[in-house]
Amino acid sequence: MEIFSASASLTLTGFVPRLLPLLSPQARTTLCKPLLSSSSTRLISCHSRIAPSRSLADQSASTGISVVDSDPIDVVKRKAMDIAPELKGASIFLVGINNSIKTNTGKLLAEALRYYYFDSDNLITEAAGGNVSAQALKEADEKAFQESETEVLKQLSSMGRLVVCAGDGAVQSLRNLALLRHGISIWIDVPLDITAKGDDDSFHSEPSPELFDTLKASYEKSRKGYETADVSISLEKIATKLEFEDLEAVTSEDIALEILKEIEKLTRVKKMMEEASRPF
């Protein structure tokens, strides 16, 4: 896959040609596989207190899926296949503060639904030529950077069968929020203290006050946009529902299954509304 380098004065005109190769069918195949192994994906740490039989058993009461001796990922995949016909290839956009929980859940959903997976921030970075060039563009021309975020969403929203981890730029303008309406938007609501601790390697270290303050400011700036999502998935609510005392016990399978159940509710409501609007 060819990645074009970017100049320091990258503009929207220069950005679009760099973006399109990343969204070609060949690039989509390259970027999206393999997503996950067949083993259970832990959200936070291999030391998390996991009770998979209990959590999945609790959820099986409402899904109708037998989870005895089942691989948790297989349970998610079966649920995904159950709702896929009603989903009709609609793309799924995950919003919320970027963290490994959101990323892992997005990849699991893509695998379960047999969708392509994209991270919109990564696409912008790759199209710009790397983190340094992307940051230089943002600092030199904030408007051009925002336009690049919109262009990414415009391209992605025109496609189907995608799971997209969207950056905060996706919820900070009315135009971008409108583009999310081309699919189903899901807010992955993770407590800031967990997000601040970072990925697995640094999860047990305490975040710096400066980092926490930065995340809090970003969260407050984007919160109203998050709240417009079709579905809100709270890590704390899932832990409470599954009777976990520690948020670390929640897995990506738990979150993905909850998302699929909420999507199923949305498709049922939509179907009922369509049937009610038909003339006698």
From Swiss-Prot:
It comes from the Eukaryota. GO terms for biological process: chloroplast organization; thylakoid membrane organization. It comes from Arabidopsis thaliana (Mouse-ear cress). Residues 1-54 form a transit peptide. It is found in: Plastid, Chloroplast. One of its GO terms (cellular component) is chloroplast. InterPro entries: P-loop_NTPase (IPR027417), Shikimate/glucono_kinase (IPR031322), Shikimate_kinase/TSH1 (IPR000623). Keywords: Chloroplast, Plastid, Transit peptide. Belongs to the shikimate kinase family. This is Probable inactive shikimate kinase like 1, chloroplastic. It holds the Pfam family SKI. The lineage of its organism: Eukaryota, Viridiplantae, Streptophyta, Embryophyta, Tracheophyta. Disruption phenotype: Albino plants. Required for chloroplast biogenesis.
